[in-house]
Regions:
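Sec/Tat signal peptide C-region and signal peptidase I cleavage site
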Residues: 18-22
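Edge beta-strand at a domain terminus
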Residues: 53-55, 123-137
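Positively charged n-region of N-terminal signal peptides that target proteins for export
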Residues: 1-4
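Hydrophobic/aromatic beta-strand elements that line small-molecule binding cavities or substrate pockets
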Residues: 61-63, 105-110, 132-135
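Short, solvent-exposed loop/hinge segments that bridge or flank secondary-structure elements
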Residues: 29-69
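Bacterial N-terminal signal peptides
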Residues: 7-16
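Short, exposed beta-strand-loop hairpins at the edges of beta-sheets
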Residues: 108-110, 117-129
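Contiguous, well-ordered beta-strand patches that form the walls/edges
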Residues: 67-105
Length: 137
């Protein structure tokens, strides 16, 4: 029984480490993506930067990206937090998304092959650099 549990744990960790394999296909936009911000750096206009968690910088822990609806939405308790996708481009195996609202602008790049996420959010005096992972739902 213990060995079965260990095998299940290793398989789960492998799925998290390689979201494209867990999804079984490249991301084609036909289904929404679930993304997790893993590493977040917050920088101020003075050049000081701090590593933080999603909770510490007031970001949802899970973000649903729906390309058909052109919408980013928090998951769970953050489900009421949304932002429209104003621009979407696919090139060289990457999806590039842009948007903005309430005085903030954001950009995200998602690898269609691996699901790796790189994103920025900027507002007056502050910027966030986010690295994470996405998987197709």
């Amino acid at each position: 029984m213990r060995r079965l549990w260990l095998v299940a744990l290793i398989a789960s960790l492998g799925a998290v480490a390689n979201p494209a394999a867990a999804a079984g296909a490249k991301f084609d936009g036909s289904t929404p993506l679930l993304c997790v911000p893993i590493e977040i750096t917050e920088c101020d206009e003075g050049g000081k930067c701090y590593l933080g968690t999603a909770e510490e910088v007031n970001l949802p822990q899970f973000i649903r990206i729906d390309l058909k609806e052109k919408l980013l939405r928090g998951v769970g308790e953050a489900a009421d937090r949304t932002t429209p996708i104003d621009f979407l481009e696919r090139e060289n195996g990457r999806m590039v998304l842009h948007g903005g609202q309430k005085g903030r602008g954001w950009t995200a790049v998602i690898s269609e092959e691996t699901g790796k996420l790189s994103a920025t959010i900027s507002e007056e005096g502050t910027a966030f650099i986010i690295f994470g992972a996405c998987t197709a739902l």
